[in-house]
Regions:
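Aromatic side chains
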Residues: 6, 34-36, 89
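N-terminal segment immediately downstream of the Sec signal-peptide cleavage site
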Residues: 25-79, 161-183
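Predominantly extracellular/secreted and cell-surface proteins with exposed
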Residues: 49-132
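N-terminal export signals
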Residues: 5-24
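Intrinsically disordered, low-complexity, compositionally biased regions/tails
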Residues: 16, 68-70, 89-91, 96, ...
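Extracytosolic low-complexity repeat regions of secreted or lipid-anchored proteins
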Residues: 106-165
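Compositionally biased, intrinsically disordered low-complexity segments
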Residues: 12, 86, 134, 153, ...
């Protein structure tokens, strides 16, 4: 065997031996993604918050955003319920991300991030957004309800996940450990 053939075979063997480690290396470099559509109930009244969002989380920041409608759900009011505010939101500083387990490419856990809300009227304000994802069918629960918690200190408003009778949440959240990027 010639020296060049030996080196080629040796390099190929090293590459093949490294393949099992590749998914772990690739996974360590990817961000966790989040997606949700949820309804929150005001902790001190009949207001509701419909909110959607998606994005990614890296060790320093949450990147993403979505849309929201804040409305008065007083049963005495006719449909359509009056909208109190509507607009978009943008994720900001990461407070914490705790992944408690995975099931395939899905993950359960709790994401806490700072966010900026922008109203169509031009008003903007800060909030803390907590996205809580449980994967009950995988036996993974954070101990908190599925959904999104929003605290808006400037207005003294707090929203918690709303539920159907029986405790099933109005909305879904999901984290993923896989992010496809075109190109």
């Amino acid at each position: 065997m010639k020296r060049r053939e030996f080196l080629t075979i040796g390099a190929g063997s090293i590459a093949v031996a490294a393949l099992p480690a590749m998914p772990a290396l690739a996974k360590a470099k990817t961000d966790t993604s989040f997606n949700f559509l949820t309804i929150g109930a005001h902790t001190g009244g009949t207001d509701m918050l419909v909110m959607s969002g998606d994005g990614t989380v890296n060790p320093a920041r949450a990147i993403g955003g979505g849309s929201w409608n804040h409305f008065d759900n007083d049963p005495a009011l006719p449909v359509p319920k009056p909208i109190l505010g509507t607009g978009t939101w943008t994720a900001g500083d990461l407070v914490s991300l705790e992944i408690i387990g995975t099931w395939g490419v899905l993950a359960a856990g709790k994401l806490v991030m700072e966010a900026r809300f922008f109203e169509e009227s031009g008003l903007h304000f800060s909030a803390t957004v907590t996205v809580n994802c449980n994967l009950g069918f995988a036996g993974l629960s954070t101990g908190l309800p599925e959904g999104v918690f929003v605290d808006i200190p400037d207005f003294g408003l707090s929203f918690v996940p709303a539920t159907f009778p029986g405790g099933f949440p109005f909305g879904l959240t999901v984290f993923s450990t896989v992010n496809e990027r075109p190109g």
